Amino acid sequence: MKSTRPFHPTPVITIDGPTASGKGTVAALVAAHLGFHLLDSGALYRLAALASVRYGIEAEDIDALVKLIDDLHITFREGCAQLDGVDVSNDIRAEVVGNRASAIAVHGPVRTALVARQRAFRKTPGLVADGRDMGTVIFPDAVLKVFLTASAEARATRRHKQLMQKGFSANIDDLLRDLRERDARDSNRAAAPLKPAADAKLLDTSALSVDEAVDQVLQWYRALGQPA
C-alpha cells in the first residue's frame, strides 16, 4: 500500500539510529545510489569544532562561533567529511576536537546555527541525512524516515572490527559497556532524545549485510512512488 505522504520537490530520507548501527554507511550508499546529497549530522558538530580550533576561536566566544558556522564550506562525499574542500575525516576524530565539540554544543545560539546549517543541506535532487534526530527534529517532513536498530552485541562487534581494521587496539567488552551507557544517555536526555519518529520505518540490522539494509531502504522509497 502506498503512503499518502505528499511528494516534496526536494525529498529527504532520514536515517537515524544509535552508535554503530550502520546508519552512516547505509546513508552514504543510499545517497550514492539515488544521486542525492549526503548529510552526516554528527560530523557537522566536529567540523565546526575543528574549524574553531584552527581559527583560534575560543569555545566561549558565541558570536564568533555562530559566524564561523554560518560561513563554513562543508561537504560530505563518498564517506568523507570535507572542510574547505579538504578531507578532514581523520582530523575530526581527534580527542581535542571531540572535547571542543562538546564544549561548543552547550551554547543555544551555536546549536541553532548548526540546525540551520543541517537544514540548508536540503537541495535538489534530494538529501539523505543520518544522525539521531533527523526524522524527529531536523526534517520532520521527510518523505521517508528510517530508524536503524541492532543489538548492542552486534554493534560492539562491528565497532571492534572497524577499530581493528584501522590499526587501533580495542576490547570488545569495553566497547559493549560503552555502547550501552551511551544508549542510556542518548535515550534519556531532555533535548532531542534518541527515539524513532512516530512514522519511521524500523530496520533491525543485527543480522543484515550492508547491501541488504540499503536494498530495504530503497524498496521503501520506491513504495512511496519515488523514482529509485
UniProtKB/Swiss-Prot annotation:
Pfam families reported for this sequence: Cytidylate_kin (PF02224)
Origin superkingdom: Bacteria
Documented EC number(s): 2.7.4.25
Reaction catalysis annotation: CMP + ATP = CDP + ADP; dCMP + ATP = dCDP + ADP
Gene3D superfamilies per UniProt: P-loop containing nucleotide triphosphate hydrolases
GO biological process: nucleobase-containing small molecule interconversion; pyrimidine nucleotide metabolic process
The entry's keywords: ATP-binding, Cytoplasm, Kinase, Nucleotide-binding, Transferase
Residues holding ATP: G17, P18, T19, A20, S21, G22, K23, G24, T25
InterPro entries to which the protein is assigned, alphabetical: Cytidylate_kin, Cytidylate_kinase_dom, P-loop_NTPase
GO molecular function terms attached to this record: ATP binding; CMP kinase activity; dCMP kinase activity
Intracellular or extracellular location(s): Cytoplasm
Enzyme class: transferase
GO cellular component, one term: cytosol
Family statement: Belongs to the cytidylate kinase family. Type 1 subfamily.
PANTHER family given in the database record: CYTIDYLATE KINASE, CYTIDYLATE KINASE/PANTOATE-BETA-ALANINE LIGASE
Identification of the protein by name: Cytidylate kinase
Gene for this chain: cmk
